[in-house]
């Protein structure tokens, strides 16, 4: 599994596919309203962690980082686990096992 090491921790590279929410604030016809669909999104970067809050799991990722001074992360996302597609859910679980494996 491809990964980077920052601050002594391994962060695996992931590609996550998920469904985003879309909204339209203005007035629209029935036809325009029915045309609203959730777009399929792709996030590429590194898995920071997975956490649970109020019984819901979330995935945190980052795409940019610095190693000078102390570890810091940028281009960060927090995605509800429930909007990930099936393969991305599997990939996150494999990445977590990789992160937790001493090596």
Per-range role (PLM):
Residues 2-103:
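Conserved RNA-binding domains used in RNP assembly and mRNA/RNA metabolism
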């Amino acid at each position: 599994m491809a990964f980077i090491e920052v601050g002594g921790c391994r962060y695996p590279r992931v590609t996550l596919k998920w469904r985003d929410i879309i909204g339209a604030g203005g007035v629209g016809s029935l036809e325009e309203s029915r045309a609203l669909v959730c777009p399929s999104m792709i996030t590429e970067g590194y898995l920071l962690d997975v956490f649970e809050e109020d019984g819901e799991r979330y995935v945190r990722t980052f795409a940019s980082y610095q190693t000078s001074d102390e570890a810091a992360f940028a281009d960060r996302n927090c995605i509800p686990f429930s909007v990930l597609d099936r393969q991305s859910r599997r990939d996150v679980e494999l990445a977590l096992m990789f992160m937790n494996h001493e090596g």
